[in-house]
Every structure is written in C-alpha cells, then in structure tokens.
Amino acid sequence: MDITVILCTYNRCQSLAKALESLAAQTLPSAVEWEVLVVDNNSKDQTRTVAEDYSRRHPGRFRYLFEPQPGKSHALNAGIRDSHGDIIAFIDDDATAEPTWLQNLTSGLHGNEWAGAGGRIVPAKNISFPRWFPPDEPRLFRTLALFSCGLEPGPLTEPPLGTNMAFRKEMFDRYGGFRTDLGPCPGSEIRGEDTEFGGRILAAGARMRYEPAAIVLHPVSPDRLRKQYFLTWWFDKGRSEFRQFGIPRDATWFVAGVPLSLFRRLARWTLLWILSISPARRFSCRLKVWTLAGQIVESYRHGHSRETVTAS
C-alpha cells in the first residue's frame, strides 16, 4: 500500500466525524492505494461507533485500532506499527482537510529525495487577534496549532506540526518513533512529540519539503485566544524543551540543581517584560518568562529525581 493516514483520537467523537468526512472526500489518482487508520486512545465516548461506521461505509478505506495505554505518543506509535503504507501522513481529530490535501502532501515522497513533508495549517474561520498578540512572531501561531511558511514550496528548515505532516515509513525504522515522555496524556499537556521527531530527522541530515497547497483547517476556539491559554502552553513548552535538550551547554553553576544561567535569563526577560510599553511586546516577553519558568521547574524535577536515585 502507498499511504496510511494516521488519526489519533481521544473523546472527540463529534469533531472526529467531521475529520473523517473530509478524509473520505480526498481525491487521489486511482493507482494510489491508501487507507485511514483511526487510533482510539482509550476514549469513553462514541468514538468507536463513529470510526466503525466509516469502516462499514467505506470498506477497505478506514480501519479502527484501539490503543489502551494513555498518551498521544503511545497512540501514534501503535498506529505506525499497524500501518500498511510506505508513506505515513498525520492529521488531528479536530481538523479537516481540503480534498487535495493528501495528494499534495505526499506526492513528493514516493521517491528518495524527501524524507517527509509538511503543509499549511490555517484557521477554520476568520479570527480577530487581541491587541496583546504579537502578529510579527510566527512562532506564536504554533500555540494555536497553525503553521505556514508562505505560499512557495521548498525545503523545510523547521519541523512541521503533527496536524499536517507526512514521512516515508522507513524514517521511523531508521530514527525511531515518537518520544513517549512528550505528547499530551492524562494529567499532562506537555507537547512537542511531533516537532521533536521532525527536528530529529532534520538534525540527522534528512530533507523535508514544505507543501503550501496541502491545506488543513484547524479550529481556533475563543478560549485559545486568552492570555492564560498562551501562558500555560508556553510554560509546558519550556518543560518540553528541557526534556528534549537537557541542561544548557553553558551551564556551569547550579542552584538547587538548576543551572544558574536559566535564572539569569529569567531575570533579564522579566525586566524586559516590566519595561516594555507595547502590549504585544510586553506579552511576548512575558511568554519568554513563562517558558523559562517551565524549563526551571523541569530542571529542578530532573535534578531532584537524579539525586533521589543516587541516594537510594
């Protein structure tokens, strides 16, 4: 088989139905064999009923897989193991794909030039950003699961988001699966499992392609346009970054197991936050403070855990 689309889901049966409907409407050449694998990560709602309904209505196109171990990365890795395609594409259960999405995203992956590809993720509806949102900082759009590198195709220099990405399956054989200490799970919203994998293969020298014509629509609910959502997201991102990259290379001195350099950066960005006049600039600095706070918390936990193991 040429392509497997993996869609992991947890307790979102209503948005899942919309996502599957958009996948059923995909237009690909008749010579391309493809499937959609719905990985149910221990949902308690009507997820299985919805998925199996699509399997009956579209025999051979949709499959259902139950993964009982909580955590999105566990579900992703289970889907990869069970996939039949030589190319694996990913989309989220609250997103919808334009009819040409899968064809545009994967068309360049049938050869050996590209290891993977990423497409654009755009808001499902027009949204108005608040005054405090810094519109000239593309990194902040990732908070809303939005992604764009412009309208021209070409090589990717940054990892795409899991809502709209694809890889040749051999990349997982070569570089491993998604890290299970990253990715949302019960009791934790630490993310980054998708960008960590993309960054891992880019760091290894593999090439990824940006396909702006591969478009996924993602909802942006009003609660995601609140300051608290951004602050929580970037705090968790700081924790994720420490798990990915560990102690900073410039760390020489430590306080309670935390690199002193992190406290210096925290003080610097706190001062910039206090002194900034522009609402957007102030909030941008504040997000940096929250990110560093997340790194410090995770660094402290890591150091405390290491001391406990050593003492025992």
Regions found by a protein language model. Give the residues of each.
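A conserved acidic beta->alpha catalytic loop
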Residues: S22, D40-T49, A95
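Non-catalytic, C-terminal membrane-associated alpha-helical segments of glycosyltransferases
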Residues: T232-R239, G246-S312
